[in-house]
Amino acid sequence: MQIGCHVSISGSIDKSVDNAVERECSAFQIFTRNPRGWHAKTLTKDDITNFKSKLKESKIDRFATCAHMPYLPNLATPKEDGFEKSVKTLVDEVERCAQLGIPYLVTHLGSHLGTGEEAGIKKLVKGLTEAGKTKNDVMILLENTAGQKNSVGSDFKQLGEIFKQLKPAKKFGVCLDTCHAFVFGYDLRTEAKVKETFSEFDKYVGIDNLKILHLNDAKGDLGCNLDRHYHLGMGGIGEKGISAIVKFANKKKIPIILETPIDDDRDDFENIRKAKEFA
């Protein structure tokens, strides 16, 4: 069982491993830099050495770690300057993951800003293909979206169509976010519905391509398109659904990463404990 959460790199990037260990994680996700800007500080030799050393000491499997793209890039944008900056950031992040020994980089698929799904997907595929040319073993994971206006890749069929256009295939995989899937319209509230939803995912995308699972309950209801993560078992998906998802991921040996809120109801420590109980 590999379960953990998104952890902070505040102070230095190796602190993320300390934060993961403190939360009793057997998997974790980070931003490799400040996610709210375009500029990234170069990783120093010490940054890289300390991160790798602590990860080795932690006994957390390297293949249960991933990084997430920063917030600003939009790979589906029709704006050429924004597109070029987004692709450059993606390539840079792939290289940073390679330096740190992180095997997976999760990316959002972006917004076509009203130009239509076909145009957005064309730009997205172009950008991802460019990043796929990097000469390392980092795999870029496409994350399904919640179905917000102008987004692409919410529907498993469309996600599969995007995924199958990407070359070389070995450079790409998928990250499934349970909150996004649920608020798009995939029912995950019972064991039977979880089985049905993952069966549809397998049909169009392929379970073998699912490398990381983002385990989040949803603040909203089924099909509402509200991208608001919530505490496990306390949202629209509920305890039965979350439990069935955890059991499925464990059976398939897919690392589970929580991106749940920290508030008066629960923190990361409690949500991780809850996830382990559901297993």
Curated annotation (Swiss-Prot):
UniProt cofactor(s): Zn(2+)
Signal peptide (UniProt feature, chain positions): none
Keywords assigned by UniProt, alphabetized: DNA damage, DNA repair, Endonuclease, Hydrolase, Metal-binding, Nuclease, Zinc
Entry's EC annotation: 3.1.21.2
SUPFAM superfamilies (UniProt xref): Xylose isomerase-like
Keyword hit for Zinc: yes
A molecular function (GO) term: phosphoric diester hydrolase activity
Keyword check for Nuclease: yes
Binding residue positions for Zn(2+) 2: 143, 177, 214, 259
Residues annotated to bind Zn(2+) 1: 68, 108, 143
Residue positions binding Zn(2+) 3: 180, 227, 229
Catalytic function, reaction form: Endonucleolytic cleavage to 5'-phosphooligonucleotide end-products
Biological process (GO), any one: base-excision repair
Pfam families registered for this protein in UniProt: AP_endonuc_2 (PF01261)
Cofactor binding: number and manner: Binds 3 Zn(2+) ions.
UniProt family annotation: Belongs to the AP endonuclease 2 family.
Function field: Endonuclease IV plays a role in DNA repair. It cleaves phosphodiester bonds at apurinic or apyrimidinic (AP) sites, generating a 3'-hydroxyl group and a 5'-terminal sugar phosphate.
Name used for this protein in its record: Probable endonuclease 4
Gene for this chain: nfo
